[in-house]
Amino acid sequence: MKKKDLRSKEWFDNPKDPGLTALYLERYLNYGLKKEDLQSGKPIIGIAQSGSDLSPCNRHFQSLSKIIKDGIKEAGGVPMEFPTHPIQETGKRPTAALDRNLSYLSLVEVLYGYPIDGVILTTGCDKTTPAALMAAATVNIPSIVLSGGPMLDGTYKGKKAGSGTIIWEARKLHAKGEIDYDEFMDMAAASAPSVGHCNTMGTASSMNSIAEALGMSLTGGAIIPAPYKERENISFETGKRIVDMVHEDLTPSKIMTKKAFENAIYVASAIGASSNCPPHLTAIAKHMGIDFGIENWEKLGHDIPLLVNCQPAGEHLMEGFFKAGGIPVIMQELLKNNKLHKNV
């Protein structure tokens, strides 16, 4: 069977339109790439860079991107990094929800309009993950999600301090006059001890767990804390994997099936995921062409027990959840009890 031409060949090696090929080619050679890199059949891999100073939850991708690129090159691909619309949930309130769609639209335009054969979608903060998955569903080129991971566990006066969770508690204490302004700010700072997104089972951890449950990220990647060496390891492996996915023509439509969405609900229910997840998952499914409404959560998730004891519903934080096995252990438990589709 004839090997399928790479999508980027239309830009960089199209004898039918030498004029445009020359225009595309010469400008991509002005920063160190060689003609052979772009015309030898190597997949062009986009890295959707969601990290910036405006997006502190994802900021460490600025350093992780080198490791991602090394993985891509190791597997025989050519990395091309590009910025995404910045999203920081706490920095854009009360309009952060609108940024999900802005980020989605900007990703779609880049993925459609540029010579990209496959893409690594870097995620972390709440809306970055649904925006990335919606774009992957729409454009349907080989895509893989790479979460930046949660912060390390926070502590305040000897107790676990979960990002967000402790602030809601501090607001009550401040309103009652039990703490002053300075202590309020100290409590908030204690909950954010490192790089990474929220260390609770908030929307960020929940949506990245859903990406893993859908099959859109490497196994075990959702909950690795941002500063851990395993986060660098999975960044490298993700870079390698996307190159293989391009050669396999493994697109989101082959991964995000209806059964995969059902698995996402099973996992989300078991981990006590954020109540923001249903509208996000519905939107992702819609862009995948799958009718998957909110009613599925009651139908599929109603009898799934809560297996994860993490804040805000429970006691622990993400670092502890990772050490306990993370999402793979949850999926194994669900499989053992016939509450998860196999081979999806």
PLM regions with names:
Residues 111-132, 143-148:
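A short, small-residue-rich loop immediately preceding and capping a beta-strand
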Residues 1-59, 64-85, 90, 96, ...:
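Catalytic or ion-coupling anion/metal-binding cores of large enzyme and transporter domains
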Residues 93-111, 325:
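Glycine-rich, anion-gripping cofactor-binding loops and their flanking helix/strand elements
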Residues 102-103, 124-128, 259:
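Short, glycine/acidic-rich beta->alpha junctions
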